[in-house]
């Protein structure tokens, strides 16, 4: 009888702990992330401190042709314990000599990256592709959250093409559904979705905005910039009943690292001109 009570208590504790586990996910445009930035110990310290807040972090504007900076970043993220973070990184993406990578860093004790692919947006040499930097989509499996499998679609939109690229994410979502049979999808990144790049009159032409399939978690009123501007450039959008239901209420917001760490304007903007946007899943 005593053994049965102990077993029951352990099962209850396990259920309680599992219920308390949440997954924190972020998208962070780290301005011109490369070897120069990773050679500055002060900046590295803060970048690692910021990224260590998250179980999955999408890093954008990775300018690192040989993955030297990415390697240094992972070394720093894993300095206290090996395999604290793993990563998935895209090839350099862009229509001309200027190229960027998408980088996902994630905690393998919380999630697994189980698959990935590049969205086929048309013929780049022909000039009829949709995105300047086509999404490199990653499928994750989480043992501890209400939604076990979900995909993340990253986008760093070109400012001048922001309206068209955000609208085209609707097609990317349909493609993910067709390829993986997956409805639970998070679309995130620096969409340049505000101020002069997306005018109020243009939202009605963006299917990702008008379709009830999608829930925008970062509002237009948010400021995701570390500069004197006030713009909601960086966004998190979710689709799928399980994923939408797993979002912790009021957890989606920019992380103002300048205020959190008491940084000067100069130091904050040396880290990046953007704040991360984050959300928690239960």
UniProtKB/Swiss-Prot annotation:
The family this protein is said to belong to: Belongs to the DNase I family.
Names of required cofactors: Ca(2+); Mg(2+)
Entry keywords, A to Z: Actin-binding, Apoptosis, Calcium, Cytoplasmic vesicle, Disulfide bond, Endonuclease, Glycoprotein, Hydrolase, Nuclease, Nucleus, Pharmaceutical, Secreted, Signal, Systemic lupus erythematosus
Coiled-coil residue spans: none
Organism: Homo sapiens (Human)
Functional description taken from the UniProt entry: Serum endocuclease secreted into body fluids by a wide variety of exocrine and endocrine organs. Expressed by non-hematopoietic tissues and preferentially cleaves protein-free DNA. Among other functions, seems to be involved in cell death by apoptosis. Binds specifically to G-actin and blocks actin polymerization. Together with DNASE1L3, plays a key role in degrading neutrophil extracellular traps (NETs). NETs are mainly composed of DNA fibers and are released by neutrophils to bind pathogens during inflammation.
Gene Ontology CC annotations of this record: extracellular exosome; extracellular region; nuclear envelope; nucleus; zymogen granule
Residues annotated as site: Involved in actin-binding: 35, 89
Listed result of changing residue 207 to C: In allele DNASE1*6
InterPro entries for this protein: Deoxyribonuclease-1_AS, DNase_I, DNASE_I_2, Endo/exonu/phosph_ase_sf, Endo/exonuclease/phosphatase
Outcome reported for the amino acid change (mutating residue 114 to M): In allele DNASE1*5
EC numbers for this chain: 3.1.21.1
Name this protein carries in UniProt: Deoxyribonuclease-1
Feature type site, description Nitration by tetranitromethane destroys a Ca(2+) binding site and inactivates enzyme: 87
Enzyme class (EC, first level): hydrolase
PANTHER family: DEOXYRIBONUCLEASE, DEOXYRIBONUCLEASE-1
Pfam families hit by this protein: Exo_endo_phos
């Amino acid at each position: 009888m005593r053994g049965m009570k102990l077993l029951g208590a352990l099962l209850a504790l396990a259920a309680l702990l599992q219920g308390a586990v949440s997954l924190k996910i972020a998208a962070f445009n780290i301005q011109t992330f490369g070897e120069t930035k990773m050679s500055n110990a002060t900046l590295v310290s803060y970048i690692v401190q910021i990224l260590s807040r998250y179980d999955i972090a999408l890093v954008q504007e990775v300018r690192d042709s040989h993955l030297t900076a990415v390697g240094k970043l992972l070394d720093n993220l894993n300095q206290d314990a090996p395999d604290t973070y793993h990563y998935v990184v895209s090839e350099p993406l862009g229509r001309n000599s200027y190229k960027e990578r998408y980088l996902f860093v994630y905690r393998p004790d919380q999630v697994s990256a189980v698959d990935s692919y590049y969205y086929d947006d048309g013929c780049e040499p022909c000039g009829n592709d949709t995105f300047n930097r086509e999404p490199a989509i990653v499928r994750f499996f989480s043992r501890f959250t209400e939604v076990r499998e979900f995909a993340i679609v990253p986008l760093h939109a070109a400012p001048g093409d922001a309206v068209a690229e955000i609208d085209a994410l609707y097609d990317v979502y349909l493609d993910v559904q067709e390829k993986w049979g997956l409805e639970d999808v998070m679309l995130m990144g620096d969409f340049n979705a505000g101020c002069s790049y997306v005018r109020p009159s243009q939202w009605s032409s963006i299917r990702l905005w008008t379709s009830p399939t999608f829930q925008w978690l970062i509002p237009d009123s948010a400021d995701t910039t570390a500069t004197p501007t006030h713009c909601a450039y960086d966004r998190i959008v979710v689709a799928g009943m399980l994923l939408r239901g797993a979002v912790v209420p009021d957890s989606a917001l920019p992380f103002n690292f300048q205020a959190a760490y008491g940084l000067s304007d100069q130091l904050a903007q040396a880290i990046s001109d953007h704040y991360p946007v984050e959300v928690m899943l239960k």
